[in-house]
Amino acid sequence: MTETELNALLAGITPANEAARAAAHAHWASLAKPLGGLGRLETMLEDAAALTGSAELDLSRRVVVVLCADNGVVAQGVSQTGQEVTRAVAENLAMRRTSVCQMARAAHCDVVPVDMGMAGEPVPGVRSCRIAAGTADFTQGPAMSRAEAVQAVGEGIALARELAEDGYRLIATGEMGIGNTTTSSAVAAVLLGQPVELMTGRGAGLSDEGLARKVDAICRGILCNEPDPEDTLDVLAKLGGFDIAGLCGVFLGGALAGVPVLADGFISGVAALCAVRLCPAAAKAVFASHCSAEPAARIVLEALGKAPLITAGLHLGEGTGAVASIPLWDMALAVYGGCYSFAEGGIAPYTPQC
């Protein structure tokens, strides 16, 4: 995909359908319960109606896509482990043995692991959307070329649209890639104009010394590459990862296809931020599942204007937080589609008092 082709696709993302949102709101108000009594469970279905264009919601087929990629910046000691762990987890994703696979089974959710750019040979059972065998070390120069960033975004768009064509009506996002909290912190710091120290956490449990190395690597990467905060693709290319760029595309693809996309934690939240910076109308497809324990996660969600369903200190990755929210969607849909109405119960409806 070329940048011109990407821009043409983005131009096709339309605003949310406010008539469908209003219809969903009216349906909630007709049900025999206190007005707005289910809080965010109600508004998220209204948002889903605005995205899909219909107050008749069917989200029964769902999938979590786990985008795997390696990051050259791990050479700077920003993580406890090396790139071999990315591959090991990808292999276990293919065998359906990881944490998210167990949670997905409980949530009746399919799992699609995707190689966006892991080091080494392809992993059997992992779908290949590979851009390259990992990114470069961004302390020495750009993590990837601009063309590669566009290609990765394009792969994510194509993936989401294909899943929609296959009948999936809810897409959860996940990722796996050693070093990707470093790339996410770097991208978020530049896009939001925030201090690197504020946007950088301990990832998978770094020591104080490890955290200092991580902050230093990000600062050096920004100094070396001078990314333009007004040019999202420039920031992605210079400081991001193939997983972030691919997830950015998944959010854009969801907006094009009218399919809700669940942001998992910090990393997919940064990807959603990139998507919305590329096309503000794409925000209609972004649904926050939880607020990660990563320090900057809340800042990213606030920038997106999204409130999480769950705040439970999760910071595992793989899409576990997104999948954990799916049963809440199921319960909301059960009430939305099955609860009796005021009219059916012979009860006078509530009326707004304020």
Predicted stretch roles:
Residues 1-354:
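N-terminal loops that bind phosphate or other acidic moieties
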